């Protein structure tokens, strides 16, 4: 089971780009909690959804530990997702401090413990923690779009390449997206942190599109010669596994 869960991370570790990465008015790293979930026997999705929206969100707001919360299901899945057998993926994005505060209240208060017990009766979820660093964000589009497409691509640093080299290259490519976003409304990197010692790479590229048509604009750009830039990136900076796509629905955004 452990290998299945970790193999699934090659598919499911998706970044849910939100304005939370703009905390304190600057682009910087934030906490991304990934919940790989399967409904327990006899539990319907509507029942689970009611728990999340009517109980968890209200509890989080009352306790001042709200997070950006999105749920993802596969669009173009790889075999690792199919083998893992999960029903959906939930992503909770906030500051590292707020994430810790939320967990302390979830585990250390009677109200949190009660909800935790109910959550575990409804679904079985494997929880992983990562850090996410934004490169390019269209804030207006991200704030308005609650139903979108998210792609991921796991990569490992090439020999002799430092993270400083990588960040410099990403900054260069982000500036190019400002001129021509090629269908994207967000791009970031996810870095494994806690419970992810067997992650399939050093980091993942995450791209957000408003819809499938926009995602195909990027694919068209690759077909029209953009593949050369992707080849150069793989040769000179990091070796990547290839894209997978998820459908994302934003269920809670404290900023909107």
Residue ranges and their predicted role:
Residues 1-4:
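Positively charged n-region of N-terminal signal peptides that target proteins for export
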Residues 7-16:
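Bacterial N-terminal signal peptides
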Residues 22-256:
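Short S/T/G/P-rich N-terminal loop/turn motif that feeds into the first structured element of a domain
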Residues 10, 21-22:
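Cleavable N-terminal signal peptides
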